[in-house]
């Protein structure tokens, strides 16, 4: 004779319990929300690279956290309707997570930079300064890029890259790497402001399916020698 089935307990909150929880955790939740808000508000490469990296870490952990929560909802679904939606959300989250990794790996093959795994954008700006390749993420697909030298400090699109440079060190070409292609920007204008400052404007001139040169030797002109089709 089979034993009687034990009913599954239903967990529910009363209004008083919810208010008590908020009172007990209100301070901690407020600090966490404030921290995330500050990171999202001021996390830009042109403001603070450290804050931007923290922002990227938070965004990076959002997808696995979302997948965990959707799987939890599937296991502990309240009814069949919730179960159906939870399964759909889980599949969508996993597919988007896999697509992110595939695109990031393809971009890494093209550039060789760990910025390829940036969850915010798939646009990586690449500039060769005296044999050193700088790679930084940019949010938008710009038609022009501006490189600025201020008393030896190099900025491009407002992002500080390095020091000890002059206008003569600026390359003839700058590239922006994407998942499917590489955009080449040609220097169209250069103006000197004082003895140690000035700026150059680069205009998008060519788009192709290339990767960055594997060697960083030589001048910035080497960036134009796009090879190794992928």
Curated annotation (Swiss-Prot):
Annotated disulfide bonds:
none
Principal localisation: virion
User: What is a single cellular component term in the Gene Ontology annotation?
Assistant: virion membrane
> Would the keyword Ribonucleoprotein turn up in this protein's UniProt record?
no
The GO molecular function terms of this record are:
structural constituent of virion
Known CDD domains for this protein? HCoV-like_M
Keyword line: Glycoprotein, Host Golgi apparatus, Host membrane, Host-virus interaction, Membrane, Transmembrane, Transmembrane helix, Viral envelope protein, Viral immunoevasion, Viral matrix protein, Virion
Q: Identify the stretch annotated as signal peptide in this record.
A: none
Q: Which residues lie on this side of the membrane: Virion surface?
A: 1-24, 77-84
Q: Where in the cell is it found?
A: Virion membrane; Host Golgi apparatus membrane
Q: How does it sit in the membrane?
A: Multi-pass membrane protein
Q: Which InterPro entries match?
A: M_CoV, M_HCoV-like
Q: Which residues lie on this side of the membrane: Intravirion?
A: 46-55, 106-228
- Chain segments annotated as transmembrane: 25-45, 56-76, 85-105
Task: Provide the function of this protein.
Answer: Component of the viral envelope that plays a central role in virus morphogenesis and assembly via its interactions with other viral proteins.
In the record, the note on similarity to other proteins reads: Belongs to the betacoronaviruses M protein family.
Quaternary structure, from the entry: Homomultimer. Interacts with envelope E protein in the budding compartment of the host cell, which is located between endoplasmic reticulum and the Golgi complex. Forms a complex with HE and S proteins. Interacts with nucleocapsid N protein. This interaction probably participates in RNA packaging into the virus.
Q: What is this protein called?
A: Membrane protein
* Organism the protein comes from: Porcine hemagglutinating encephalomyelitis virus (strain IAF-404) (HEV)
The gene it comes from is M
């Amino acid at each position: 004779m089979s034993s009687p089935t034990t009913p599954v307990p239903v967990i529910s909150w009363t209004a008083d319990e919810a208010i008590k929880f908020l009172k007990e955790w209100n301070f901690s939740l407020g600090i966490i929300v404030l921290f995330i808000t500050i990171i999202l508000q001021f996390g830009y490469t042109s403001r603070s690279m450290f804050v931007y990296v923290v922002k990227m870490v938070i965004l990076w952990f959002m997808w696995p956290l979302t997948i965990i929560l959707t799987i939890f909802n599937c296991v502990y679904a309240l009814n069949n309707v919730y179960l159906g939606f939870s399964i759909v959300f889980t599949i969508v989250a996993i597919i988007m997570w896999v697509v992110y990794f595939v695109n990031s790996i393809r971009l890494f093959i093209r550039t060789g930079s760990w910025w390829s795994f940036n969850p915010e954008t798939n646009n990586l700006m690449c500039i060769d300064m005296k044999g050193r390749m700088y790679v930084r993420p940019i949010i938008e697909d710009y038609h022009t890029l501006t490189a600025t030298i201020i008393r030896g400090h190099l900025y491009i699109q407002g992002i500080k890259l390095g020091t000890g440079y002059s206008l003569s060190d600026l390359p003839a070409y700058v590239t922006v790497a994407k998942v499917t292609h590489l955009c080449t920007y040609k220097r169209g204008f250069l103006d000197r402001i004082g003895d140690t400052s000035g700026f150059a404007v680069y205009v998008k001139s060519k788009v192709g399916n290339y990767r960055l040169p594997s060697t960083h030797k030589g001048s910035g002109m080497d960036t134009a020698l796009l090879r190794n089709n992928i």
